[in-house]
Amino acid sequence: MKQEETTPEQRPPARLPLWANPRIGLVVLLIALIALFTTLRPAFLNTQLTLVPMQADISVYAVVGLSQLAVLSLGHMNMAVGRMAAMSAFASGLLHDRLDAPLLVALAGGLAVGALLGALAGLVISRTGVNSFVVTLALDFALIGLVSLLYATFTDGVAFNGLPAGMSALRTDTFADYCAGDVCGPEIPLLAPIALIAVLGVGLLFRWSRVGREVLMTGANAKAAELSGIPVRWRVVQAHALSGLLAGLAGFLLSANNGSFSAGVGDGFLLPSFLAPVLGGTLLVGGAVSVLGTVLGTAITQVIYKGLNLLQFQVDELKLYIGLVLLAALSLDRLRHVLAERRGVPA
């Protein structure tokens, strides 16, 4: 009996081995860093000193990373992510200070301002064809002056004094503070579920929704997407609006974590906004994103920062070593991709 031959076209594609899976690599790196810092400083696992504050920071900066991820999906950049957060925080603070708005109304107002700023940037980019880097950088400079002017006009200094009812609890409380009889919740800050909702929402958007898929197709090849009937300009506006909305949410979370709506909200957002998604596997050229990878990238960044801080590194040293460690991580990730390609498996 003649034996059937299997041609290359008939063979199933090579499966990605565990060692070449980028998410597995990030999890292994995260576990290794936690083990290292715990060995060097056992206080790293102290709940109140390290774990709860670190969870709050991860919650804030995961949303910051998602804000940048929204436009990286197009191959664009949002250089104004920090200033959009500051403007959103100002709007929330103003609504409470002048109109005595409750927490949810103040939050909604801030998110609306962030989304409008993002949509404005997206509209300019889609209509003029000017590079997103240039447009959002110009917007960033404009908002720097506007934020300072607005805070100087509407506050006594650089921050609103009061907070909406319930916002202080977001800063100080964990689920362990709420009990049903003798059963109390875990030591997880109240900020975490808000960030989790954002993570799930963005993940579902890009995974299952038509809009998310069309944004990714636009990022992969805008001309081909337009020829296939996708409203490319509208998708650009929507992606930038989402970026602004998430920046606004991050500004609100940081304000809650800091205990005030201040002009300095968002000052340190730009670098982390790129580090988390890129470390997590999101492509700078567009067309592919990783929401889970962004969360893992954020966790790795914050673990490094907290660990080095416990080891009493100075601020400049912290920046240096965080940069070196992340550069090494990105280089190893690239090496893994090259090795995977040589073995004939998709990276």
Where are these predicted regions, by residue range?
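Cytosolic-side transmembrane-helix boundaries in multi-pass membrane proteins
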Residues: M1-A35, T39, A220, L227-W234, ...
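Single transmembrane alpha-helix segments in multi-pass membrane proteins
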Residues: I34-L40, T47-L99, L123-V130, P277-L292, ...
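Inter-helical junctions in multi-pass inner-membrane proteins, predominant
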Residues: P42-P53, A152-T155, F206-G212, H240-P277, ...
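Membrane-helix/interface signature in polytopic inner-membrane proteins
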Residues: T50, L200-A241
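Transmembrane helix-bundle core of multi-pass membrane transporters
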Residues: S132-W208, R235-Q238, N258-G266, R342-A347
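Transmembrane alpha-helical segments in multi-pass inner-membrane proteins
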Residues: A247, N257-I322
